[in-house]
Amino acid sequence: GVPVTNLIAANSSFRVAMLFFAAVNVTAFVLTIFFIPSLPTMGTVPYGKQLGVLKKPAMLLSIVIVVFLNGAIFGFYSYISDFFGTITKINASTISLFLMFYGIANIVGNMIAGKILTVNAKLSTFVLPFVLAAAYIGLFLTGRLTAATAICIVVIGALAGINSNVNQYLITQAGPEAPEFSNGLYLTSANLGTTFGTFICGLFITAMDTRYALMGTFIFVAVGFVAILLKMGMEKSIITANEGGKNVEWKM
């Protein structure tokens, strides 16, 4: 939606772009009413039980992971059009095309995520920060080259889709007894990550230039990876304690 809207705005006017955006939203609303089935209710979960998931160390660490990994991706994404214009030096139409590549790759990433999480969720979570860091390093080093930037953006778009699924998995896995509340926590954590990531990346832009917004991304990826290590270490200690026949208070 965003790339197409940008393309329309670049070739016509802001008014036409907003009309297109409104038409898409109305269409989605109508399709939701007539084609999305009602889901059966599973009963109301008491508020105390829902809030209780916030006492779980696994949930708290999952929230930290989501905030920082999502901040890493969308903190930079907030400035990606400016990056294309000032660093890669491409015109508005090409920027819209690049954003469309990103969006399509994001959809592909969602499909990939479903498969890799089914095969090995823990390994997928562990590897994700490394691949993210490598993709952003590639963009930092080759951002002035149009073809190389296009390749990096496709990879980053796919990783953004994978990241969203991994993040939601981490939150819901940590709070299965309150699925609706956990889903709300995921959305809140993701939005917080976008807010903080945009702020930090913006500071680097103010101090240097748009290219160095990626430094904020590297920081967020690093902190997210540390949180992943802490969560995995905690899970391992709980498994070890359970195997030893000890009583464990933490629930994963």
Question: What residue ranges belong to the model's regions?
Answer:
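Helix-loop-helix hairpin linking two adjacent transmembrane segments in secondary transporters
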Residues: 1-36, 79, 83
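A membrane-interface helix-boundary motif in multi-pass transporters
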Residues: 7-23, 203-222
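Helix-to-loop junctions at the C-terminal end of transmembrane segments
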Residues: 9, 108-121, 205-206
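Multi-pass alpha-helical transporter architecture, strongest
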Residues: 31-35, 218-252
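Juxtamembrane intracellular "pre-TM" segments in multi-pass secondary transporters
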Residues: 35-65, 250
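Extracytoplasmic gate region of multi-pass secondary transporters
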Residues: 58-100, 104, 121
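C-terminal transmembrane helical hairpin of 12-TM major facilitator-type secondary transporters
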Residues: 122-167
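A late C-terminal transmembrane helix in Major Facilitator Superfamily
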Residues: 173-210, 216-217
